[in-house]
Amino acid sequence: MPLKRNTGLMILMLCTLALWAKSVSAGSSFLSPSQKPQVRQGKGKPPRVGRRDIESFAELFEGPLHQEDKHNTIKAPFEMGITMSEEEFQEYGAVLQKILQDVLGDTATAE
């Protein structure tokens, strides 16, 4: 009798283990069977944005001043907006240009 009982328990444990393994493997992915996981094509680094030379950087400051909103926008590798009056721009424009050239200019020529 104990042999039949042990065999029954062993079969019950195997069935339970098989059902548990199926439920664990079914919950391991959120994709449906018809969907395949996406594979990354390009594993390289994204391209870097290069520095601009001083001549092209100086061209950013040339151009008409917006009279209606008094908002100056400078576009470099990023965009920065400064709001000031025309008198303030006349007074501080050269200083701002020098600071931005020192910050964003080529490090070899800045030193």
From Swiss-Prot:
Lipidation (O-decanoyl serine): S29
Keyword Chloroplast recorded: no
Record field: compositional bias (Polar residues): 28-38
Main location per the UniProt record: secreted
Signal sequence bounds: 1-26
Propeptide: 53-111
Xref: InterPro entries: Motilin_assoc, Preproghrelin
Positions of the UniProt region annotated as Disordered: 28-51
Any Gene Ontology biological process: positive regulation of gene expression
Keyword annotations of the record: Amidation, Cleavage on pair of basic residues, Hormone, Lipoprotein, Secreted, Signal
A single MF term (Gene Ontology): ghrelin receptor binding
Lipid positions (O-octanoyl serine): S29
Record's function text: Ligand for growth hormone secretagogue receptor type 1 (GHSR). Has an appetite-stimulating effect, induces adiposity and stimulates gastric acid secretion. Involved in growth regulation. Induces the release of growth hormone from the pituitary.
Protein name in the entry: Ghrelin
Annotated source species: Oncorhynchus mykiss (Rainbow trout)
